[in-house]
Amino acid sequence: NLGLVQGTMPAFIIIIARVWLKEQINLIQLFGVLITFFAVLIVVSSGDFYSLRDLQLNKGDVVMICACTLYAVYAVGLRKKPKIGALALLTFFSYVAFLGSIPGLFYEIYTDHLILPGLKGIIILGVIIIFPSFLAQIFFMKGVEKIGPARSGLYTNLVPVFSFILAVFFLNELFQMYHLISLALIFFGIYLFENKRQKVK
């Protein structure tokens, strides 16, 4: 369900950008967004759409929908950020997140649920800190600054596809034809969105 809900994030971003920033979107661009979402469906279902019938909404899905909505607000809000660099802004967010996590840390210590990572855990944490938490956020901020939230949001649908590609190299999973089809559809959807935008300009 996670990948399916995450696939709706570009739609959330476009809706919020339309309301907040008055960004225009036409039917061709909307069709491009739908194509990228269809590509996510292919990946989530492993090419078998009948498997989607077994999906059921649960509390985790509601939490994920809230997360996607809030991240969409964040993505659109980046266009209204102060005139400071991406690194300075990310540093500020990091300090806020650090302070916000302190009560949870004390709670885990108090309830004797604190688990310290071993060597493997430290390595994994290092990878998470450097790549998704730092570099990815910097690149996303720069992307929103350059091309806007609506266009940047479309690229988030590449996440499940690239996740599978990385799994092929690091987890020895098989690369299937539906991965290639999904990747092609996402780029086609982005092309439609971008091409129509250029013609309008």
Listing of model-derived features with the role each one plays in the protein:
Residues 13-15, 19, 49-111, 139:
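Transmembrane alpha-helical segments that form core, pore/gating elements
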Residues 25-37, 61, 84-94, 148:
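Cytoplasmic-side transmembrane-helix entry/capping segments in multi-pass membrane proteins
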Residues 19-21, 25, 81, 89, ...:
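Hydrophobic/aromatic residues within transmembrane alpha-helices
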Residues 1-24, 149-168:
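Specific alpha-helical transmembrane segments that line the substrate/conduction pathway
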Residues 25-47, 157, 166, 178-197:
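Hydrophobic transmembrane alpha-helices of multi-pass small-molecule transport proteins
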Residues 1, 31-32, 56-63, 120-125:
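Short alpha-helical transmembrane interface motifs in multi-pass membrane proteins
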Residues 42, 62-77, 102-151, 162-167, ...:
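Hydrophobic alpha-helical transmembrane segments of multi-pass membrane transport proteins
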Residues 1-4, 27-30, 88-92, 124, ...:
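Signature of the 12-TM Major Facilitator Superfamily
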